[in-house]
């Protein structure tokens, strides 16, 4: 029995809520000595092995063109996205990265309108998106509106946002041709495969003593099983059912859930400016999704 349409919106919100927690898990792993490339590699490798149990039979797509599209999906939604984002975090301010990365829904909308005639952008969607983006800015900069420009870092972050936008379009293209789980498995495989060249610059040195620490193991499994395996499958279903524009709009909620998690887990304070930003995000997303 197919889910009612409204449930896909709930799935989108829950998926983005889980992704909002990934920043905290990644921070814990980095504090334990893992590099961003290692975190991504272990995360996608575990997710790939997990999804292989569910979808082991089919190896390839119907033709090499579709296979290349999924290679591109593994790059744009995996290795390139995480590599550029995490590299940018080491170059520019975290606030810059958090804000610029949330332009992904806006970029997705622009690309969707350019490449797909079926995608439409109403005034409500445009104004709602801009209001939500303003809310993201209020949460990220938290009243300190000093944007320190770091050209390389900011361009890398913009590339990450653009990469995710292209990933969304690729999933839309492939969604009608292959099962969602098969597509997601291929994304994980090519994501792992295409991150390997990064280890030529920074060789991988697995430390069993570190990897088996409870905090490291728990957060790696959270990122791999819940945030990757389960959430990527769910998100790809949402993209198929709601369309790239409407689905991507929920990504604006990401900083909101990160803020709440930081308050509950890291005991970080929530200011009035951040609360105002949260209100803008919720109202903006509702406005954009309302028909």
Where are these regions (language model features)?
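Hydrophobic/aromatic residues within transmembrane alpha-helices
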Residues: 29, 39, 43, 88, ...
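Hydrophobic transmembrane alpha-helices of multi-pass small-molecule transport proteins
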Residues: 51, 71, 105, 111, ...
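Glycine-/small-residue-enriched transmembrane alpha-helix faces in small-molecule transporters
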Residues: 1-38, 42, 75, 147-173, ...
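Helix-helix packing/entry segments at the starts of transmembrane helices
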Residues: 10, 42, 82, 97-103, ...
